[in-house]
Amino acid sequence: MEILRLLCEGMGLRPDYFVGDISGSRVAVDINHYPPCPDPSRTLGLPPHCDRDLITILLPGAVPGLEVAYRGDWIRVQPVPNSFVVNFGLQLEVVTNGMLKSVEHRAATNSAAARLSVATFIVPADDCVVGPAEEFVGEGNPPRYRTLRVGDFKRMHNVVNLRSSLNQITNIKSNQE
């Protein structure tokens, strides 16, 4: 996938770093429909979370609803026609040893119009091992995350209280910090 190759180039990784099991034994697609809500302050389309996989490519649709956490506030992302949003997932945060962060986000509803979004997830194989790449670890920069099989990572992610994305990343952080 071209976007992963470009990420490698920008981060100083070999161009084929994400080729194979880590770049996806499969691609998952979620189509989300959010009907209008008479009182959007009382319900969310999706609660705050970080995506667990490598990257997410989101076609947000024309109606605003994606919000990202920034310095304690929620910032609404305005959809741009004919464009995608690329979210870095928790597994990419692990590979880069925290250089790239998975951003906490949520889907908000609105009272005026229904919203449709399409999310495509690059899903590493369950038996793939993900940990900080050696290019991001060295003297003065120890591994900040544990190396885990993706299947184990998913199980940990699924049992964590999804109300707190911080708990998700804490569970995979290395105890060396």
Where do the model's predicted regions map?
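C-terminal flanking tails of non-heme Fe-dependent oxygenases
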Residues: 1-177
